[in-house]
Amino acid sequence: MKLQNSFRDYTAESALFVRRALVAFLGILLLTGVLIANLYNLQIVRFTDYQTRSNENRIKLVPIAPSRGIIYDRNGIPLALNRTIYQIEMMPEKVDNVQQTLDALRSVVDLTDDDIAAFRKERARSHRFTSIPVKTNLTEVQVARFAVNQYRFPGVEVKGYKRRYYPYGSALTHVIGYVSKINDKDVERLNNDGKLANYAATHDIGKLGIERYYEDVLHGQTGYEEVEVNNRGRVIRQLKEVPPQAGHDIYLTLDLKLQQYIETLLAGSRAAVVVTDPRTGGVLALVSTPSYDPNLFVDGISSKDYSALLNDPNTPLVNRATQGVYPPASTVKPYVAVSALSAGVITRNTTLFDPGWWQLPGSEKRYRDWKKWGHGRLNVTRSLEESADTFFYQVAYDMGIDRLSEWMGKFGYGHYTGIDLAEERSGNMPTREWKQKRFKKPWYQGDTIPVGIGQGYWTATPIQMSKALMILINDGIVKVPHLLMSTAEDGKQVPWVQPHEPPVGDIHSGYWELAKDGMYGVANRPNGTAHKYFASAPYKIAAKSGTAQVFGLKANETYNAHKIAERLRDHKLMTAFAPYNNPQVAVAMILENGGAGPAVGTLMRQILDHIMLGDNNTDLPAENPAVAAAEDH
């Protein structure tokens, strides 16, 4: 033993041990450094990143839909309001088998194939952890049945929502419009406008009328709640809530009672009536018949119901007051007279003898007057009172289409009126350039003549006729027709402000009074074409009627409504205002093909009596269309 120990080199072994220990220590130190560096990177450098990831798994933002603003009429009557409805919703991430769950729900809440198809479509475009509607507008029985069976459906729940409701149905559809489910086009538009985030919890959006035009005002600001969820996606607790901001309530210039009254008068007719206050431009009534119930669209109209509306020959989907285009006919004669006087084409003393026709100079072409035997010697006033066509044929010929189109454009024809509805057409005020572009033909002198009496290529909407009438009433001062009266903001009413537009012509020329006096004669003097309707009124009315031909008559052919198909009969138009010396109301009316009941003058008188006298009589006599055709010009 002693011999073996004498050969061991303890110094070398000690040095080797020290080296190994040093290497091990350095290795441990290096590994510890790497660990510390990684801990530093995780805890310090990337702390925010990992905290965010953790919170994204743990914390969810749940959007809260704002309450949509209420729409009121001028007297504070709600025209569009919100009602609580219940719908069943599913969060697919919380459901083990979506299809089995849907099948099981069929017997519980009467789920249909259409409901399931709508759910799948909505799911395809929704974000994760979004609650998706499965069936809307549940009945009390369906809610109760689900409550009893809820334990069978984790991830499915019934929620209450505010749903739009229109209590007056078809009476206001073409004005108020409606909201309906947000579709792909809406999503694309909202995204392009940078507004999509504000609709995270909203299912409906304004599609038509006031609901569409003032969507940004009515919708409000979406809120949200911050909640903590577990690994199964179930909410553990609420961390924070930012309440939504309700949309603003708005008040319209409309008078609901007047709107309903006029709709009753027009029942059965294809017609439109616009009633305004010429002092402000506020629209008191805007009626288009036939109409339809907007509530059909709120929950999503069925294909059958929509096809019925779309294929209805009476076109109830069209707002005739703003989208219907018709020859304005003789209703424009007062404006043509003011234009010709202002342009120096005629004077107050200009006269013309009317034998019952007017002949185009240098041609054998004759243009007939509605009165076969003629009106005799005419001046400006008498030509308006008797609605003499020949006088205005001559005026149109002398003015020429360029000046005539320019002046009628000042009265708003051929342009949008500015009314706060997106559903509006501009009609057509013909020009040389328009005809060349449309028909690839030049403008002939013969084209100008019928324009002088509101015929030919000229088309206009009832709202344009209303705006032109207000310009005349106000001696050339322009009032833009509008439906918004005020918006409720912070407990205050913020009124709508009339935009400034340059006046038409010289407001002090006196020509306006001359034209209005002619309209006064139409309604009050024995030779006036509408004398029989208005002369007996206890207040003074000024009016101008018109007849728009749907098809042309042959030479020497007499119009007989009884021998013509209903759809080919003349349209009947009328504009009027009252009281004459201090106008408070202006009315424009169109009865397609003469309407289905009383004559246009009878209806106009009844509307004015209702406004001025409170007369609510709607039991009016039906009139012979052939007789009415001979009287309304």
Curated annotation (Swiss-Prot):
Pathway: Cell wall biogenesis; peptidoglycan biosynthesis. Catalyzes cross-linking of the peptidoglycan cell wall. Responsible for the determination of the rod shape of the cell. Is probably required for lateral peptidoglycan synthesis and maintenance of the correct diameter during lateral and centripetal growth. GO terms for biological process: cell wall organization; peptidoglycan biosynthetic process; proteolysis; regulation of cell shape; response to antibiotic. This is Peptidoglycan D,D-transpeptidase MrdA. The chain crosses the membrane at residues 22-42. It is a single-pass membrane protein. One of its GO terms (cellular component) is outer membrane-bounded periplasmic space. The keyword DNA-binding does not apply. Coiled coil: none annotated. Residues 43-633 are periplasmic. Belongs to the transpeptidase family. MrdA subfamily. Keywords: Carboxypeptidase, Cell inner membrane, Cell membrane, Cell shape, Cell wall biogenesis/degradation, Hydrolase, Membrane, Peptidoglycan synthesis, Protease, Transmembrane, Transmembrane helix. Inhibited by mecillinam and benzylpenicillin. Inhibited by diazabicyclooctane (DBO)-based avibactam and CPD4, with IC(50) values of 0.59 uM and 0.01 uM, respectively. The active site is at S330 (acyl-ester intermediate). Disruption phenotype: Temperature-sensitive mutants grow as normal rods at 30 degrees Celsius but grow and divide as cocci during prolonged culturing at 42 degrees Celsius. It catalyses: Preferential cleavage: (Ac)2-L-Lys-D-Ala-|-D-Ala. Also transpeptidation of peptidyl-alanyl moieties that are N-acyl substituents of D-alanine. NCBIfam families: pbp2_mrdA, PRK10795.1. Its main location: membrane. HAMAP family: MrdA_transpept (MF_02081). It comes from Escherichia coli (strain K12). The gene is mrdA. InterPro entries: Bact_Transpept/Beta-Lactamase, Beta-lactam/transpept-like, PBP_dimer, PBP_dimer_sf, PCN-bd_Tpept, Penicillin-binding_protein_2. GO terms for molecular function: penicillin binding; peptidoglycan L,D-transpeptidase activity; serine-type D-Ala-D-Ala carboxypeptidase activity. The keyword Ligase does not apply. It comes from the Bacteria. Residues 1-21 are cytoplasmic.
